[in-house]
Amino acid sequence: PSIANHFSTSRFTSRGICLTDPPPQRIKNENGEMVYNPLYRKKDKLTHYVTKKRQYYCATLSELALQVKEGRESLIKRAAARLNMFYDYVLIDEFQDFREFDYELIIKLAKHLDDILLVGDYYQHSVSARNNTGKPFKTPKGDVSYADFVECVMNAGFEIDTTALSKSRRCSVDVCNYISSKLEIGITSTGDHEGHVIWADNIANDVLSNDQITKLVY
């Protein structure tokens, strides 16, 4: 099945992908009230996933791929067959940052791949309290714990390895010990670097303004 045939658009030709978000279903009017957005297109229309310039919305690509099917055949099976043809392994890094349709796409795609490896750290996920809707971080029962996350991935058919990458090459022994004792996260260090945990309450501005100090903030 093709995307064009799925939406009964036989002559559709895409022009790539854009990073612009698609029009939301509801928007605020001048009075601050939520009203229907006339630019919104329903999910059963190709224009829900494609701009007027025939570019796919990046934000809805996974959702689109999941629904294109015809009988027992699907776009996911077709994509997996091509990946298997050209690649021995499919490697996905930062797996913990995938959720909702992106997460579902990976899980369903994996069922048809010859070999796939997912690498990720639950405790480094970028999902916050504001955007934690959907799998694997939100279920009808509530938020998902580390144990729940591991069980969810295991139930999807994956073998779980929690030890191979348990040693950090980035963090020092002191930092790892601090994390383990305060947050009860099982992490150790390879000991390749020196580093200490310090409180910068009184020198925060000096640290931020000092270009000689490497920081993970902007």
Residue ranges and their predicted role:
Residues 1-218:
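The feature marks helicase ATPase cores and/or their adjacent C-terminal helical subdomains
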